[in-house]
Amino acid sequence: MKSNAFDSSMMISRRGFLSVAGLGIMGIALTGCGAKGTAAGTKGSTAGSAVSSSSTSVRVASLKGPTTIGLVHFMDQAASKDSGLANSYSFTLSTAADEVLPSLIKGDTDIALIPANAASVVYNKTKGGVTCLNVNTLGVLSVVTADTSITSLKDLAGKTVYLTGKGTTPEYVMNYLLDAAGIAGSVTLEFKSEATEVVSVLTSDPTAIGVLPQPFATAALAKNQALAAPIDLTDAWNEAAEQSGDDSQLVTGVTVVRNEFLDEHPEAVEEFLKGQSASVEYVNEHPEKAAKLVVEQGILESEAVAQKAIPACHLVCLTGKKLKQALAGYLEVLYRADASSVGGTLPADDFYYQA
């Protein structure tokens, strides 16, 4: 299991931002982006017997990670000849956000499920050319350790914590939470390039403490019974937000649409949103059945890991005011840490759909 697929579903790096920002200069000559993705759910999802000739073809791009897990039931529905949908849907799954963003910017993708900060980057790059439809995934990070004395963030004081994502959102999130807990100066963050390296440290040292994304956290716990995940950073963020009096949440993934497509095909966008919302509800209520679909779509290899990881992925469909409340404050935290992580400036109000 490669870590980049799931790390990339949480963040876009500074390097990734610069590569996207340079598309205009480079003439957007990135013909290989589509080749790196994997077409998914295409059988019966193009115009067929169940779709009228006046239907709209909707091109959806997403990532092989938590941001797509909540969509798998809708993907399965769209692939059926008896889907009952008015429009046709094609899905492309990629392993990194940097593969999806050029396609979205060029207009080759209509709707995309991408990291929250990447959505802000694209908004700025396109001068407000995309709209955020919803938050689809909250936090997917957990503190993992065999040290039973660790039960809260304050217990990390004086400790070393191993994690991935130096110079990207995991580092900014961790710094924010440690500062909120009043222990920022007493915790050492040691970064690894791969989540598997963090798992290796946890396996070899029973006193080690790590921060892992899903599904790596679930997989690590399944392989090593001594490990536990005592702190869910999504819950820790909620506590910090409550203390500071804001409504922000720890956000991993969002769904965006090109404004040109939204203006031309509002009914298709609404149908997608309805299907996505129902899909998230299905996945959360039926993790065992959903796990099978997760494997079928090539997101994970193990149904057992998928089933256990689903509850920890915090799959949601936050729209309207809840969307803006959750996302705006999160982007503000990232902006304060590194403005380039959100594209240089924070999105204006028109970024938030029906907020």
Predicted segments with their positions:
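Short, solvent-exposed loop/beta-turn-alpha elements that line the ligand-binding surface or hinge
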Residues: A79-N87, T234-S248, L315-K324
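Conserved C-terminal helix/tail region of periplasmic/extracytoplasmic solute-binding proteins
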Residues: A328-A355
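Sec-exported extracytoplasmic/periplasmic mature domains
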Residues: D76, I105-K106, N124, D179-I183, ...
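N-terminal secretory signal peptides
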Residues: M1-I12, G16-T31
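Secondary-structure end/capping motifs
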Residues: L262-A337
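Pocket-lining segment of extracytoplasmic ligand-binding domains
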Residues: N117-A118, E197-L293
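Bacterial signal peptide processing site
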Residues: G34-K36
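Short, glycine-/small- and polar/acidic-enriched structural segments
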Residues: A40-E190, Q214, A226-D232
